[in-house]
């Protein structure tokens, strides 16, 4: 009996395969053309992921770069912010940056071209804590926005990094995606990190019915995208309390 093809699964995997191939081609161009300008490489790296997310996420979610604000604080610059503009538009929208209320944020990304130090990943925990604390102090919803560290290349062992993260007292990063190695996820109880090694999967280096060969980076991106879509489905954003903001802002502006 001929095996029936699941077209949804086939085209889903093929779409991610094409997207990651496009990303890798663009990355190689960046490495060649911007070899002497690390700042430019970083911005281009953010732009590549930004483009992928804008193409692959539902229209409910808007993808921007900028700052997150609540009643009392403004975050440091966030590389990529996924926010629900249907709930509330940005408080400020400039040529390249926005300021969005924490109430509408679904995910914040820290994007790195390369990240090799365990200490650097632990530093990312501090950045994630800022966003999580802003949400806790301002939003009624229990489910916090995601914080993801997305890395294109890293000279670290995924297993050792998992151990370092679990030995730390911090549990603020939800996911670390390293395209060339795999992923590290925070479990649903927010108590422990566990790693996903693409090299351990049977599908790697096998040829598909569509003619292309599945590489480790394809499996990493398929897992990352599936995780992101599922997690965003469970995040409930809300409209900020504009009446309260109005009263407090007028009080401060008029120095009452």
Task: Show where each model-derived region lies.
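Intrinsically disordered, low-complexity Ser/Thr/Pro/Gly-rich regulatory segments
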Residues: 1-77, 82-256
